[in-house]
Amino acid sequence: MEQVSASIGNFTVDLFNKLNETNRDKNIFFSPWSISSALALTYLAAKGSTAREMAEVLHFTEAVRAESSSVARPSRGRPKRRRMDPEHEQAENIHSGFKELLTAFNKPRNNYSLRSANRIYVEKTYALLPTYLQLSKKYYKAEPQKVNFKTAPEQSRKEINTWVEKQTESKIKNLLSSDDVKATTRLILVNAIYFKAEWEVKFQAEKTSIQPFRLSKNKSKPVKMMYMRDTFPVLIMEKMNFKMIELPYVKRELSMFILLPDDIKDGTTGLEQLERELTYERLSEWADSKMMTETLVDLHLPKFSLEDRIDLRDTLRNMGMTTAFTTNADFRGMTDKKDLAISKVIHQSFVAVDEKGTEAAAATAVIISFTTSVINHVLKFKVDHPFHFFIRHNKSKTILFFGRFCCPVE
């Protein structure tokens, strides 16, 4: 489970960096858990170079290395390239890790909502291998649903969108557009995640006021700024000119972490140094409770909501997952024929943060077609300029949602 959480964390930073290349100074928000889950369900059927590329991009390769080094097992001289074959026993820990996380997230609870689901929509005339259906159910609880892509693609699209909308409490609507589902579509693999929780310590609505949010040194926009004074775990990174705060949700099973640069320099958002230095190892180290100090804080945090919808096809190709999108794609783990390729990877996400807490949801469809300083005084933590944030499942240390807030949405 820890290895899969680390894989998702490394993928989070890689994906953010790639999205940042074309979205500088813009808001970015996505669910690395949702994207990784949908792609892992696809990876379950991948073979050869298709599987190797997917494993590299999703950081499954490191997880397998970690597994093989922790289990003292003599090498039988198998060719190295076989190591990440999804049928190979050593890839099993990847899929088992996803199963454990899925079970942990979907555990019944009264205090907050966290759930995630997978589903396979398949053209009713297209035969999937029983082994694939069995494994996808075993590891991903993914039930196959037969639909009529061939002659009723629009009806199939609506059915998928309705399922996603239901799974996400209507926060993700119209995940798939008419252009996404065609008569040539054979398979759509979908993951949905929904999260809603109240803060452990809530903001008082009467203390919320209109204040400026600085977009740059000279530009600002008004926002509804929430305020409270309370004790929170804080990390101060003087050398890197930023500080981080952990805002726990009720029961402390999940937290939002906010990474805030000390200030904005001319012509920047203030996030540049942090983004240059950002790695998953550092993020894990910073968010370690042993690194953080319980501090009395005057916390100012804007109310905000973000929504995004992206086709990740080009992004994933640029990250190195190329073969899966071509006629050379090999998904013979799900069919006898070598006639399937991924045509799109659609991801839609939503987050809303207010005085009570946070609501966040996301869905991903893979469309397959033919040092800390101790502070004794009150620390001012005023989030009035661009920042990074992520929502983490604390026990497994899995990043469920990750984002950058640069600009308040009208």
From Swiss-Prot:
Tissue-level expression: Detected in all major blood cell types. Highly expressed in granulocytes (at protein level).
Motif Nuclear localization signal positions after renumbering to this chain: 80-84
Result of altering residue 109 to Q: Reduced interaction with DNA
Effect listed in the UniProt record for changing residue 214 to A: Reduced interaction with DNA
Outcome, altering residue 107 to Q: Reduced interaction with DNA
M-loop required for interaction with nucleosome linker DNA: annotated segments: 61-69
Origin superkingdom: Eukaryota
Pfam families: Serpin
Gene Ontology process terms (BP): chromatin organization; chromosome condensation; nucleate erythrocyte maturation
A single GO molecular function term of this UniProt record: chromatin DNA binding
Stored SUPFAM superfamilies: Serpins (SSF56574)
Principal cellular location given in the protein's record: nucleus
Region (Required for oligomerization and DNA condensation): 356-372
Mutagenesis / variant outcome for changing residue 78 to Q: Reduced interaction with DNA
Gene Ontology cellular-component terms listed: chromatin; extracellular space; nucleoplasm
Impact noted for substituting residue 332 to A: Reduced interaction with DNA
UniProtKB keywords: Chromatin regulator, Chromosome, DNA condensation, DNA-binding, Nucleus, Protease inhibitor
Effect of residue 358 to R: Strongly reduced inhibition of cysteine proteases
Protein family according to the UniProt entry: Belongs to the serpin family. Ov-serpin subfamily.
Subunit structure: Homodimer and homooligomer. Interaction with DNA promotes oligomerization.
Function: DNA-binding protein that promotes DNA condensation into transcriptionally inactive heterochromatin in terminally differentiated avian blood cells. Promotes tight packing of nucleosomes into spherical clusters by binding to linker DNA and subsequent oligomerization. Acts as a cysteine protease inhibitor towards CTSL (cathepsin L1) and CTSV (cathepsin L2), but does not inhibit serine proteases.
Protein name: Heterochromatin-associated protein MENT
Organism, scientific name: Gallus gallus (Chicken)
Lineage: Eukaryota, Metazoa, Chordata, Craniata, Vertebrata
Gene name linked to the record: SERPINB10
